[in-house]
């Protein structure tokens, strides 16, 4: 990983190139997904951070809670060609993700509907869990993380971005934002539990992983952090 590489959102040209895959096929088509992905890429340092964390590994990536599959497009734009598999409980998003990926000709990429609260895929390689953890209760979070740790193989990495539990202004804004995402229908569930940094670190270290954790909120108002873990 390159220190400091994840402090800013993607440059304008890169963001437009990636978001372009989500533009409607016809001028009068629905531009919601295009506008959302472009705004996300231009404002959020998530993808530079995740791309940097995965760079240098050829391990297949499982993206748990993949949404529209934006990570797959960002990986390919970055020149990372490892197999990608995205799972999410939102069938509508998965349908759109698969359609856009096929239209864009994304190689070695697949998508499927899966509720991570009740089912886990079989996988060996790297695991990405991005802005998902808070939608599971504490017990389900612990089970998911133990299973994700067991999936790491070779030079595979566990890469997570999540809002952490604290009493900061950023923490309060994160909770409000997550509730709003549920109210407008973008997220199917309300947040259930925000983890704290030390509990996450302790659990993953018990699983035999080396853990790094640092802020990843850039210029956004949210209390987002990036966790990267790998086998010792």
Features from the language model and the residues they span:
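Class I (Rossmann-like) S-adenosyl-L-methionine-dependent methyltransferase catalytic domain
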Residues: 2-59, 68-120, 139-140, 159-232
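A conserved beta-strand element that flanks and buttresses the S-adenosyl-L-methionine
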Residues: 128
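Conserved beta-strand/loop positions that form the S-adenosyl-L-methionine
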Residues: 64
């Amino acid at each position: 990983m390159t220190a400091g590489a994840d402090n800013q959102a993607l440059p304008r040209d890169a963001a437009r190139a990636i978001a372009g895959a989500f533009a409607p096929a016809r001028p009068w088509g629905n531009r919601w997904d295009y506008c959302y992905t472009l705004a996300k890429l231009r404002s959020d340092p998530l993808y530079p951070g995740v791309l940097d964390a995965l760079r240098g590994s050829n391990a297949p990536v499982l993206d748990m809670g993949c949404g529209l599959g934006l990570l797959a497009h960002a990986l390919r734009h970055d020149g990372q060609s490892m197999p990608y598999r995205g799972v999410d409980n939102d069938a509508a998003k998965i349908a759109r993700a698969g359609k856009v990926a096929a239209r864009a000709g994304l190689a070695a990429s697949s998508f499927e509907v899966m509720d991570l609260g009740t089912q886990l895929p079989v996988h060996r390689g790297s695991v990405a869990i991005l802005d998902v953890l808070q939608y599971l209760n504490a017990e389900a979070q612990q089970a998911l993380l133990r299973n994700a740790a067991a999936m790491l193989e070779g030079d595979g990495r566990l890469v997570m971005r999540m809002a952490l539990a604290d009493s900061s202004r950023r923490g309060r804004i994160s909770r409000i934002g997550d509730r709003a995402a549920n109210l407008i229908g973008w997220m199917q569930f309300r947040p259930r539990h925000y983890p704290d940094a030390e509990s996450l670190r302790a659990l993953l270290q018990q699983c035999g992983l080396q853990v790094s954790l640092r802020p990843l909120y850039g210029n956004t108002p949210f209390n987002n952090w990036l966790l990267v873990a790998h086998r010792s």
